[in-house]
């Protein structure tokens, strides 16, 4: 039986990584929960809106009502604040929470608490309790409860420190060296099964948008073992380090949750969100990883909500299903998606050679189409479209214009196919 998993908040990069890691699993059915209008509206088939924010007094009651009404089995927190809330209220939440205990989560949520807890360790950067303790510049300030590099900045003078510092910040030594994220996984017995370092090559709004796998330094592995020995991690977690002037690693932060860029190692075979579920369900786990170099780079992509209903898809063959001698994989994605939704697909073409032979050569099954119609050059495609609940896809402007004018249905060029893709499917 599938277990129902509620990811909250559903619109963070962490949430999308959890969703991408679980969406093909036969073990789970995914639900999303959101407090805001965000990209989750385009990616979750089962999205529950209207959540209060996690610091709202009514949040717990709302969450429990959602859990009860939808028979949710597990809540997968996807933001540092929701991780802390779920760990602190685990006994009150009507489902299993996929986060470790509140002591570990509380220490990780506050950089001040993290540095105080590990103050005897040499990998902790030098910190200053007040601006008056700072003698040499530059130094670095960052929010006590921030995440990533958001709100953090280099301070080069006392006047700049006085202008920017308040009690919500921690003051640290400036670390000029390279920055790394270290992805880790701890099983249900507290054993560190996975520890891999990666380079944060490009960062945007505190999120690593280009990251590269690399060999894990022994010093980094030692830090991981010491963190794992003193805190109670369960499943996936990560920490970030940076080198000081002497080339020594210093801890920047540690988090007990899924890293937002976990997709890097997911694509070497290590599915952190799924493995974490197995650990929380009490299953023994092991890890198999493909040994190759891999780089992850990401940017904004577009998802569309298009206001049309249709049951029929008419599309051309040349320069639509194929581009030169290659199959257009993006169009085929749409074709299979339409077929899965029960749309009736008609191939309407003026193909000059044997279309059946060419479909076979391209590896495209004729079973995808309800009908295959090959027209003479002199015939009009608009004469063959009778339904009004249809769309027409063709690279020819002249053909699209005639169909639009005569049939009054939406028409699409090949570059518009992306607007027809349903990312919830």
Model regions: which residues?
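Substrate-recognition element of Asp-dependent hydrolases with the DxDx(T/V) motif
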Residues: 331-360
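Phosphate-binding site of ATP-dependent enzymes
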Residues: 153-231, 242-250
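ATP-binding N-terminal substructure of ATP-dependent carboxylate-amine bond-forming enzymes
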Residues: 1-98, 413-415
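A conserved helix-loop-beta module that forms one wall/lid of the active-site cleft
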Residues: 88-158
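ATP-dependent carboxylate activation and anion-phosphoryl transfer catalytic cores
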Residues: 70, 215-222, 226-311
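Asp-based phosphoryl-transfer active-site loop
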Residues: 310-324
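Acidic di-acidic motifs
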Residues: 10, 316-318, 392-396
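Conserved Lys-Pro-Asp/Glu-containing loop-to-beta segment of HAD-superfamily phosphomonoesterases
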Residues: 380-398, 403
């Amino acid at each position: 039986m599938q277990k129902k998993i509620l990811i909250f908040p559903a619109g963070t990069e962490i949430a999308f990584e959890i969703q991408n890691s679980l969406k093909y699993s036969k073990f789970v059915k995914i639900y999303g929960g959101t407090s805001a209008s965000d990209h989750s509206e385009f990616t979750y088939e089962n999205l529950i809106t209207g959540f209060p924010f996690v610091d709202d007094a009514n949040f717990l009651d709302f969450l429990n009502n959602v859990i009860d009404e939808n028979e949710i089995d597990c809540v997968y927190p996807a933001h540092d604040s929701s991780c802390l809330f779920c760990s602190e209220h685990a006994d009150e939440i009507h489902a299993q929470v996929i986060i470790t205990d509140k002591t570990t989560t509380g220490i990780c949520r506050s950089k001040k608490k993290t540095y105080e807890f590990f103050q005897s360790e040499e990998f902790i950067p030098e910190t200053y309790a007040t601006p008056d303790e700072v003698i040499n510049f530059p130094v670095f300030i960052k929010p006590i409860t921030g995440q990533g590099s958001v709100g953090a900045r280099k301070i080069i003078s006392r006047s700049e420190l006085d202008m920017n510092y308040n009690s919500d910040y921690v003051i640290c030594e400036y670390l000029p060296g390279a920055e790394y994220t270290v992805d880790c996984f701890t099983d249900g017995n507290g054993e560190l099964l996975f520890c891999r370092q990666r380079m944060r090559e490009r960062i945007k709004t505190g999120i690593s948008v280009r990251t590269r796998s690399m060999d894990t330094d022994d010093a980094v592995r030692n830090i991981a073992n010491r963190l794992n020995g003193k805190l109670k991690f369960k499943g996936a977690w990560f920490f970030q380090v940076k080198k000081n002037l002497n080339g020594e690693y210093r801890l920047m932060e540690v988090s007990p949750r899924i890293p937002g860029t976990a997709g890097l190692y997911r694509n070497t075979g290590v599915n952190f969100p799924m493995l974490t579920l197995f650990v929380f369900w009490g299953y023994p786990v092991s890890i198999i990883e493909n040994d190759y170099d891999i780089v992850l780079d990401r940017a904004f992509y577009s998802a569309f909500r298009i206001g049309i209903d249709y049951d029929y898809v008419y599309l051309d063959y040349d320069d639509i299903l194929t581009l030169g001698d290659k199959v257009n994989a993006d169009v085929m994605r749409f074709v299979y998606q339409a077929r899965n939704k029960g749309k009736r697909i008609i191939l309407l073409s003026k193909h000059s050679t044997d279309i059946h032979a060419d479909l076979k050569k391209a590896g495209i099954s004729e079973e995808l189409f309800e009908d295959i119609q090959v027209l003479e050059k002199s015939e009009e495609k608009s004469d063959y479209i009778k339904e009004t609940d249809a769309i027409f896809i063709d690279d020819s402007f002249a053909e699209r214009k005639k169909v639009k004018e005569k049939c009054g249905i939406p028409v699409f060029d090949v570059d518009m196919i992306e607007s027809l893709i349903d990312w919830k499917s």
